[in-house]
């Protein structure tokens, strides 16, 4: 199924296509419409099946559609079990949100916390 058929905005579809994807995977086709509709979802799929895009794309779209207001605050929080996965998920969010005003910040252990705190005070999506 094409990403535009899932209810994603033109700018998100463009960002996805610039990353080399034209068709959604089964997990994306099932998850994206449900998340966009505001439904809760618990999903599992094998490695490499597009799970990150399955939740990242609707999160980005929903945040883009919200009134941002004048106060900067955390809008979404994504938790991962490892620093490596946090970095990978963060990288994907940044690629997909390239046409938005969202600020995406990776936060994880093993590095100086002061810079991360500064970024947290300015950002909107964290993990």
Question: Residue locations for each model-derived region?
Answer:
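The conserved Walker
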Residues: 45-49
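Generic secondary-structure boundary/loop-capping signal
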Residues: 3, 33, 54-57, 82, ...
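Conserved pre-motif I regulatory segment
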Residues: 1-44
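Gly/Ser/Thr-rich beta-alpha loop segments that engage phosphate groups in nucleotides
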Residues: 22, 40, 50-52, 111-112
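Conserved nucleic-acid-binding Ia/Ib motif block in the N-terminal RecA-like helicase ATPase lobe
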Residues: 5, 10-21, 69-127
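Walker A/P-loop NTP-binding motif
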Residues: 29-41, 52-70, 87, 92-96
């Amino acid at each position: 199924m094409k990403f535009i058929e899932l209810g994603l905005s033109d700018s998100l579809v463009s960002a996805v296509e610039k990353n080399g994807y034209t068709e959604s995977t089964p997990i994306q086709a099932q998850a994206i419409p449900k998340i966009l509709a505001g439904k809760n979802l618990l999903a599992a799929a094998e490695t490499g099946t597009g799970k990150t895009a399955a939740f990242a794309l609707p999160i980005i779209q929903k945040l883009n559609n919200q009134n941002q207001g004048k106060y900067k605050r955390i809008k979404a929080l994504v938790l991962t079990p490892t620093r490596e996965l946090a970095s990978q998920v963060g990288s994907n969010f940044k690629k997909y949100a390239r046409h938005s005003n969202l600020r995406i910040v990776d936060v994880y252990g093993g590095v100086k916390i002061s810079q991360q705190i500064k970024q947290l005070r300015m950002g909107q999506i964290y993990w």
